[in-house]
Amino acid sequence: MDIFLAILPAIFWGSIVLFNVKLGGGPYSQVLGTTIGALIFSIGIYFVVQPELSPRIFAVGIVSGLFWALGQTNQLKSIKLIGVSKTMPISTGMQLVSTSFFGVLVFHEWATTVSIILGVLALIFIIVGIVLTSLEDRRQKTEETKGNMKKGIIILLISTLGYLVYVVVVRFFDVSGWSALFPQAIGMVAGGLILTFRHKPFNFYVIKNIIPGLIWAAGNMFLFISQPRVGVATSFSLSQMGIVISTLGGIILLGEKKTKRQLIGIGIGIILIVTAGVFLGIAKA
């Protein structure tokens, strides 16, 4: 039962972008709807759990949420350019690399020889995995597809910065997940409004995309519930499995066309990135 709870965040987070794409709307309507859904769920959680809230916790949570909005908006923009099945493995790999480097440099993780070996192996696996999942179709290789891939990577670098700050700022100020959840959601909505208002995102798609926001917040809730039961390392490792759902979902549910060569590359790449996530989880322990 505990392992099942720990897998739920991966299932929920891995399906968010699939819901976004399936429900429709551009990246701006999608991200705004998602943030509103997260806020609705987080308000409910706040009244049930009643975690500690102070001006410091509120400020940290809002900053974290603002940067989450930056990360999510740009991830959705990348999906529009290169698709879910390419975006999600690359995005996950970039996030793992950036948070790992930050963890080593600032929080002095990987303190033992074993953790250093596992960490370095994980980074190598991630880099190889990203290369394999981003293979182009040789028959359809045009200047436009090359240009889209380049733009997608640049957009994902900005997205990774957003996700990095979203994760790190909460840890740096030692704010618990339960306490951060509500102010984070406020920051997410504020960030969503700031990033999207020029693009006139207010339409019916915003309402439809509230559903992925509810799913995101539910994933967070199950992460907080599972961590004390299975440990941070295990819950972190299992949460990386979401890449399998989002990538395969992009191909199977959204009908993204892939050649045999690309499918093999994506399959091996996913295995490498998930393995890297497990290694990093062990290295953190």
Regions found by a protein language model. Give the residues of each.
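Polytopic alpha-helical membrane proteins, predominantly small-molecule transporters/carriers
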Residues: M1-A285
